[in-house]
């Protein structure tokens, strides 16, 4: 492809973007990059009278990315486009790879799939009942009004047409009980808090919040901490909710004003119910919390708490009522963080991190026998930090996905064939045999920078490996052997700033960005 043809294609792409502009727009910014499912378009329109309006996918983006990358000799490309009506537009293409400090990322848009994002869902029917939900809401509002001494105004109802349009934009039909709620009140109106101390979003706010959560979810992934990024913990009841940080099937319908929401789950796991309610958002670092099997059950529960007297009246102005949400239950913590293993671990424990109470040299710490973990059937993460583990075979029947540990003389042999291990951060003093890594079907992340390794050649056979961290000397040996893992997406040279020559051998190109400028017509 010639430069003139490439420039023409870039101008046509900008014209296609602005052809879909909303009325009254005053500017836009769009970034296009490769992703696991094809090109990802992250963009927004500036529109007077409100916040940014998120931009949807643009036709032809993938083809243009590929054409520019091929013409420039890049592994991949990243596009940024900015403009305003009647003003200058800027179209910039850069290599899609990123070199930062000691790490090169060949595909910055890559997000490793979470364990249960696309597993088969529930075949169970919804648990909600529209009539019962509305009856519970009305009874709750009457009871609260009596306690507060004033009646609160609900918002006007949404029309069936407004509800249908919101569902079209969401790509989901809402559960019948939530639909009935919106056909009664589109938002909280004059109520201080309609559901569990939170405001009911309007339908327009619901769509905006859902789009924001989908956008923000792309930034949860971090190459340096796979345990947090890709091994979410599972909420109770087990098997009801997908183990994800976020999901397109989780539709927010309330807000606390600080980034936390109730959401209806329209993609439940096998033991869940369509329309079950989750607590998601900024404060749920480990993933969602299960709240109720339906909006109906949530509203009925609130009415029950009110009728049983599980509430407190706050003297602020305006006065409000605060429900005691968990008067009967203290859930077990799913994480353990201490200097030793728990003496009596419960069945809900999913993450164990062992940290010394005071700084201690690794060699001064006694090896840790993992045998007690046999009683932890849902263990997903095990982080021993600097401790050496003995009894690694204990982990064979457990669903562990992330392991950071020192290895004893048995090396990796006790882990051979483990079906779930996806991320390994290892340390050892004696030369390590990497052959057992070939038997780990889920392995995608590996840090051997704290290991002595007999032969790094086996790494070239790990077709599923996406991340590899080695020392500078280990990288030199691996590249000399021409044994780079074939599907590598990110690489780290531990203890040294990544040199351009090393990065180029990994796949990071040298080359200047490609830039086109022009004028946009008034109004697009």
Identify the role of each PLM range.
Residues 1-18, 88-119:
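Short, well-ordered, aromatic-rich surface patches in folded extracellular/luminal domains
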Residues 12-13, 20, 45-49:
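Charged interaction scaffolds used for protein-protein
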Residues 34-59, 89-102:
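Extended intrinsically disordered, low-complexity coil regions enriched in Ser, Thr, Gly, Ala
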Residues 38, 43-46, 118-257, 390, ...:
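A surface-exposed partner-binding patch
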Residues 70-89, 245-248:
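Elongated alpha-helical scaffolds
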Residues 278-309:
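Compact, glycine/acidic-enriched structural inserts
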Residues 297-357:
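Low-complexity, Gly/Ser/Thr/Pro-rich intrinsically disordered linker/tail segments
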Residues 326-341, 351-369, 378-391, 399-412, ...:
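Concave beta-strand-loop units of leucine-rich repeat
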